[in-house]
Amino acid sequence: MGDERKRESLTTEETETYVYVRDVPALEELLECIREAGPVALDTEADSLHNYFEKVCLIQLSLGSEHYLVDPLAGLDLSGFLEVLAEKPLILHGGDYDLRMLRTSMGFRPRRDVFDTMIAAQLLGIEQIGLAALIEQFFAISIGKEGQKSDWSRRPLSERQLRYAVNDTRFLKSLAERLGGELSRRARLEWHSESCRAM
């Protein structure tokens, strides 16, 4: 099945395409896209709810309108992917956990700026700082939370899990732009940068 492009009907009228990266050709395509991309929206799914020794089970990335789901359990050599990714500015939501998991399990350390949308929301005094709540507030789109308690270590992953995973990064760039603009208007961007550097 390899490089699988799936078109999903999400909560907006547009149709999204994502690539499920489980073989070398799909991974090479992703590397080329990352090299040419600007900031990369990043998230991970782990098996912390189902296993004592947690591990990264899925890595989600959005590069503009392109969305990739990388399967770390597929036996691929991800060292080149992680090296290229480390050179890109990253956008995450509640990224402390994701970066810690990637660091401890894969040795990944970002070398460029990180923008955390949850920290931005906190600095702006927004009460509901969960990703779904922020997307609802800023874009009037409901993305659902049905995948939060999934066992991400089990294969195959379901269509519902994959759709949930795509939504974790799909809106991050637009959300970061909105929150970043408000941080700048309130002269709080440096506070945010300092908090992100501490992750």
PLM region spans:
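Short glycine- and acidic-rich boundary segments immediately preceding or forming the N-terminal edge
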Residues: 1-18, 29
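Intrinsically disordered, low-complexity sequence elements enriched in Ser/Thr/Gly/Pro
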Residues: 3-5, 168, 186
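Conserved DEDDh/DEDDy metal-dependent 3′-5′ exonuclease domain
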Residues: 18-28, 32-42, 46-182
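Acidic catalytic cores of enzymes that act on phosphate-bearing nucleotides/polynucleotides
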Residues: 183-199
